[in-house]
C-alpha cells in the first residue's frame, strides 16, 4: 500500500472522552471513529488489524472441525419466548417491531437460532457431533457503553455451537475448542489465562473464560503462583485452613459506638484490627414455603461478599438483592450498621457465616441495637445456630483451591468464553435426534464465543508505549514501513523504494511505502503510532554509502544494513 493512496487519520492528542489506553490509541491511530455512543466505524488501519485476527480465528475454527455458517442478526421473538429468555434477558436485549407488529430482537447471541437450525437439519445420531461457527456483528444495549470497542453496543464476535448425543461427546468437543482458543491467543501473541467461570445468562453447568492480562481489565482473575489453577474471582473457592474456632478468652461486652456505621469506623473507634470484626448483611430470601423473608450473611470485616456464590445457596432470591431498610428494622429492631449475628436466629432469621468468619473467636459484631456493638463474641457460646458456606471473594495470599501455592490476583479483559450448555436449549426448543434404537434423544450443546473486535483493544492494552501501539507481529496493520526521504524529488530514492516495495510484497509481506510529501518526523511518528513492527528508511545519503536505516519498533536503536541484504534481512526478522 502506498501511503499517498491511504487514509491517514492520525491525531497527535487523544480525545478527552477516551479513558483507557486502547480507546485513546485507536482514535489517535485512525483505526476507528465514533458514530454514536457505543457505535463505531472501522477505518482502513483498524479493519486491517481486525481482519488479521478474524483470519486466525477462522483458521483455528476450521482446524477444530467447525463449519462456518451465517445466521441473521434480526431474530424473531418466538424463538426467545420458547427458551424463556425473552423475559429473562433484560434491557440489554434490543427489541423491535416490524410494520406488521411482529416482535424481533437484534441478536446479542445465537443459541436460539442455531438450535432452530439443528432441530430442522439434524435428525439422526449418525450426523453428530456437529459443530457450527459464524463471525458476525452482535448488538447489546449496554446501559453505559464505554472504553471504545471494549464495551460497545455493536461488536463483532465469533460464536460457535456444537451438538452431541451425550455428555461424553460434548466434553470431547469442549476440550478441542478449549485447545483451539489457546491456539488463537498463542498465534496472536497475547499474555492470557483460561479460567474457570460462572455461566451467567447463557446458562449451562461448566465454562471457561479466556482473559488477556491487563491493568485496565474489568475482571479480577485468581490463579495459583505454583500451579495451573486459574478462575474468575466470582468462582474461585475461598479456602480456610483453620478447622474450628479457638476457645473463648473474653466475656461478651456491649459497647456504645456512636455514628459508627461501617466496619472501618467501628474498628478505628474501638482500636481493633478489622480482621477481628465481622460484618452482617441482610439479603432478600424465601422460606421453606417460598414466602419472602430475609437472611443474614456474616463475613470477616476485611472480606467482600461474592454475589455469585450467594446466589447458588438454596432460598436466596435471584438476582442477589439486599433487604430493604424498612424490612431490616422491622425484623431486627435496628438500622443497618449495627446488625450482628447474635439473636438473629431467635428472630427467625437464617444466619449464614462465611468459612473464615465461622472460625473466629472473641470477635466484634453489631449488637442489633442502634449505635451499639458487641466485643468478645463467640459462635458456640453466643450465637450457636448458624450455617457455614463459602460466600466471599478470594484475596491474594489465600491458599490455592488445588492445594498448590497461594492465590495471586490480576486484572483481566475477557476475550473468550466457552460453555457446556447441556440440554437446556435443546429441551426448550425440542431439538432431538433418533438414536441407534430409533428413540428420540434430546441433543447436548456446547457454546463457544470469541470477541473479535474486543481482541483488538485487548492487544493494545497489553502492548503500547509512550509513542503508540506495539502490535504483536501477527496482527500488525503492516509488517514493514518503507519511509522514503524526498520520494518526489530523488529518482534514486524513488527507484530503490519501488524495488524494495515490489520485492517485499512478492515475499508475502504487508508493506506500507510512505511516499507522502511530509516531513520525516511526521512519517516516523505515524509509523510508531500505528505500531508497524519494522521500518526501513531510504535516503540519498544512505544510498551513497550503499545502506538503509533499519529500526525495530520494540527496540530503541537504529542500525544500518546493506542495500543488497535488505530483503533477506527483513525476512529473517519475521
Curated annotation (Swiss-Prot):
<dbReference type="InterPro" id="IPR023717">
    <property type="entry name" value="Pro-tRNA-Synthase_IIa_type1"/>
</dbReference>
<dbReference type="InterPro" id="IPR036754">
    <property type="entry name" value="YbaK/aa-tRNA-synt-asso_dom_sf"/>
</dbReference>
<comment type="subunit">
    <text>Homodimer.</text>
</comment>
<dbReference type="InterPro" id="IPR045864">
    <property type="entry name" value="aa-tRNA-synth_II/BPL/LPL"/>
</dbReference>
<dbReference type="Pfam" id="PF04073">
    <property type="entry name" value="tRNA_edit"/>
</dbReference>
<keyword id="KW-0547">Nucleotide-binding</keyword>
<dbReference type="Pfam" id="PF03129">
    <property type="entry name" value="HGTP_anticodon"/>
</dbReference>
<keyword id="KW-0436">Ligase</keyword>
<dbReference type="InterPro" id="IPR007214">
    <property type="entry name" value="YbaK/aa-tRNA-synth-assoc-dom"/>
</dbReference>
<dbReference type="InterPro" id="IPR002314">
    <property type="entry name" value="aa-tRNA-synt_IIb"/>
</dbReference>
<keyword id="KW-0030">Aminoacyl-tRNA synthetase</keyword>
<dbReference type="GO" id="GO:0005524">
    <property type="term" value="F:ATP binding"/>
</dbReference>
<keyword id="KW-0963">Cytoplasm</keyword>
<dbReference type="InterPro" id="IPR004154">
    <property type="entry name" value="Anticodon-bd"/>
</dbReference>
<dbReference type="InterPro" id="IPR050062">
    <property type="entry name" value="Pro-tRNA_synthetase"/>
</dbReference>
<dbReference type="InterPro" id="IPR002316">
    <property type="entry name" value="Pro-tRNA-ligase_IIa"/>
</dbReference>
<comment type="similarity">
    <text>Belongs to the class-II aminoacyl-tRNA synthetase family. ProS type 1 subfamily.</text>
</comment>
<dbReference type="InterPro" id="IPR004500">
    <property type="entry name" value="Pro-tRNA-synth_IIa_bac-type"/>
</dbReference>
<dbReference type="InterPro" id="IPR044140">
    <property type="entry name" value="ProRS_anticodon_short"/>
</dbReference>
<protein>
    <recommendedName>
        <fullName>Proline--tRNA ligase</fullName>
        <ecNumber>6.1.1.15</ecNumber>
    </recommendedName>
</protein>
<dbReference type="InterPro" id="IPR033730">
    <property type="entry name" value="ProRS_core_prok"/>
</dbReference>
<dbReference type="InterPro" id="IPR036621">
    <property type="entry name" value="Anticodon-bd_dom_sf"/>
</dbReference>
<keyword id="KW-0648">Protein biosynthesis</keyword>
<dbReference type="GO" id="GO:0005829">
    <property type="term" value="C:cytosol"/>
</dbReference>
<dbReference type="Pfam" id="PF00587">
    <property type="entry name" value="tRNA-synt_2b"/>
</dbReference>
<dbReference type="InterPro" id="IPR006195">
    <property type="entry name" value="aa-tRNA-synth_II"/>
</dbReference>
<dbReference type="GO" id="GO:0004827">
    <property type="term" value="F:proline-tRNA ligase activity"/>
</dbReference>
<dbReference type="GO" id="GO:0006433">
    <property type="term" value="P:prolyl-tRNA aminoacylation"/>
</dbReference>
<keyword id="KW-0067">ATP-binding</keyword>
<comment type="function">
    <text>Catalyzes the attachment of proline to tRNA(Pro) in a two-step reaction: proline is first activated by ATP to form Pro-AMP and then transferred to the acceptor end of tRNA(Pro). As ProRS can inadvertently accommodate and process non-cognate amino acids such as alanine and cysteine, to avoid such errors it has two additional distinct editing activities against alanine. One activity is designated as 'pretransfer' editing and involves the tRNA(Pro)-independent hydrolysis of activated Ala-AMP.</text>
</comment>
<dbReference type="GO" id="GO:0002161">
    <property type="term" value="F:aminoacyl-tRNA deacylase activity"/>
</dbReference>
Amino acid at each position: 500500500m502506498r501511503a499517498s493512496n491511504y487514509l491517514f487519520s492520525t491525531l497527535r492528542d487523544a480525545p478527552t472522552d477516551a479513558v483507557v489506553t486502547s480507546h485513546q490509541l485507536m482514535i489517535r491511530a485512525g483505526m476507528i471513529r465514533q458514530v454514536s455512543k457505543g457505535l463505531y466505524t472501522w477505518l482502513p488501519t483498524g479493519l486491517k488489524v481486525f481482519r488479521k485476527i478474524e483470519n486466525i480465528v477462522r483458521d483455528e475454527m476450521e482446524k477444530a472441525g467447525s463449519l462456518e455458517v451465517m445466521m441473521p442478526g434480526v431474530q424473531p421473538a418466538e424463538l426467545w419466548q420458547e427458551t424463556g429468555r425473552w423475559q429473562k434477558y433484560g434491557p440489554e436485549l434490543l427489541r423491535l417491531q416490524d410494520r406488521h407488529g411482529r416482535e424481533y430482537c437484534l441478536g446479542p447471541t445465537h443459541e436460539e437460532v442455531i438450535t432452530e437450525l439443528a432441530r430442522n437439519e439434524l435428525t439422526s445420531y449418525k450426523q453428530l457431533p456437529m459443530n457450527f461457527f459464524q463471525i458476525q456483528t452482535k448488538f447489546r444495549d449496554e446501559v453505559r457503553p464505554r472504553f471504545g470497542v471494549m464495551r460497545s453496543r455493536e461488536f463483532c464476535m465469533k460464536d460457535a455451537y456444537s451438538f452431541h448425543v451425550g455428555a461424553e461427546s460434548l466434553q470431547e468437543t469442549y476440550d478441542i475448542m478449549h485447545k483451539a482458543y489457546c491456539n488463537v491467543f498463542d498465534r496472536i501473541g497475547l499474555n492470557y489465562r483460561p479460567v474457570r467461570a460462572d455461566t451467567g445468562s447463557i446458562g449451562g453447568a461448566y465454562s471457561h473464560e479466556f482473559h488477556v492480562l491487563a491493568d485496565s481489565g474489568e475482571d479480577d482473575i485468581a490463579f495459583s503462583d505454583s500451579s495451573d489453577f486459574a478462575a474468575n474471582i466470582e468462582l474461585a473457592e475461598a479456602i480456610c485452613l483453620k478447622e474450628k474456632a479457638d476457645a473463648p478468652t473474653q466475656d461478651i461486652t456491649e459497647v456504645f459506638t456512636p455514628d459508627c456505621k461501617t466496619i472501618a469506623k467501628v474498628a478505628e473507634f474501638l482500636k481493633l484490627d478489622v480482621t477481628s470484626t465481622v460484618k452482617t448483611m441482610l439479603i432478600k430470601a424465601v422460606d421453606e414455603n417460598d414466602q419472602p423473608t430475609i437472611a443474614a450473611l456474616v463475613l470477616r470485616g476485611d472480606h467482600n461478599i461474592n454475589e455469585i456464590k450467594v446466589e447458588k445457596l438454596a432460598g436466596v432470591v435471584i438476582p442477589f438483592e439486599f433487604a430493604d431498610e424498612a424490612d431490616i428494622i422491622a425484623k431486627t429492631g435496628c438500622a443497618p450498621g449495627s446488625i450482628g449475628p447474635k439473636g438473629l436466629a431467635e428472630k427467625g432469621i437464617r444466619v449464614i457465616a462465611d468459612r473464615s468468619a465461622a472460625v473466629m473467636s472473641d470477635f466484634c459484631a453489631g449488637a442489633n441495637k442502634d449505635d451499639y456493638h458487641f466485643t468478645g463474641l463467640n459462635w458456640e457460646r453466643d450465637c450457636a445456630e448458624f450455617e457455614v458456606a463459602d460466600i466471599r471473594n478470594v484475596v491474594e495470599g489465600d491458599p490455592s483451591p488445588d492445594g498448590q501455592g497461594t492465590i495471586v490476583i490480576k486484572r483481566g479483559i475477557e476475550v473468550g468464553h466457552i460453555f457446556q450448555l447441556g440440554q437446556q436449549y435443546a429441551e426448550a426448543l425440542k431439538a432431538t435426534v433418533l438414536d441407534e434404537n430409533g428413540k428420540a434423544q434430546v441433543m447436548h450443546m456446547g457454546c463457544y464465543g470469541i470477541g473479535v473486535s474486543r481482541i483488538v483493544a485487548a492487544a493494545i492494552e497489553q502492548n503500547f508505549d509512550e509513542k503508540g501501539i506495539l502490535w504483536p507481529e501477527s496482527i500488525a496493520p503492516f509488517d514493514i514501513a518503507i519511509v522514503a526521504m524526498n520520494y518526489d524529488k530523488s529518482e534514486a530514492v524513488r527507484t530503490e523504494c519501488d524495488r524494495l516495495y515490489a520485492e517485499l510484497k512478492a515475499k508475502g509481506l504487508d508493506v506500507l511505502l510512505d511516499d507522502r510529501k511530509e516531513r520525516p518526523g511526521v512519517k516516523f511518528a505515524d509509523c510508531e503510532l500505528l505500531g508497524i513492527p519494522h521500518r526501513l528508511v531510504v535516503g540519498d545519503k544512505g544510498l551513497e554509502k550503499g545502506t538503509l536505516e533499519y529500526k525495530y519498533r520494540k527496540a530503541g536503536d537504529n542500525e544500518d544494513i546493506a542495500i543488497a541484504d535488505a530483503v533477506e534481512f527483513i525476512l529473517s526478522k519475521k
